[in-house]
Amino acid sequence: MPRLFPLLALLPLLAACQMDSRQQVLATTNTQAAQRAMSTRAFDTGDRARVFTAVIASLQDLGFVIDRADNVLGTVSATRFGGGLVRFTVTVRPGEGARTIVRASGQLNHHELSDPAPFQRFFEALSQALFLQANQID
């Protein structure tokens, strides 16, 4: 019992170190908004199947092995080995009008990718693949 009193005295100090829940929500929202902006692109085509095929081709061009591809749901999961385990999941969905929205998420060794470079490389490869498809260049 005497040992319990010093521990109880430290309890208010620990509570003072805790972040306010409102601050947590605001910090998370900013981070999520930045992540969403970095990992989402809209393409000016209503042909979701063509974009879906281009996503698969782009991931393969970048050295990924396709784990799962579901055209009905519009999701592709892929893995790349070497320099760490990289997993990418891409969702293709219809947007407003004749647009298609592509959103990617990634993990490096089970940690969320926050570096914009892998997303930029993927979207550049996807844009090139869509351009080649539109111009029927194989």
Spans of model-derived segments:
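Bacterial N-terminal signal peptides that target proteins for export
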Residues: 1-7
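C-terminal motif of bacterial Sec signal peptides marking the signal peptidase cleavage site
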Residues: 13-16
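Ser/Thr-rich, low-complexity intrinsically disordered terminal regions
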Residues: 18-138
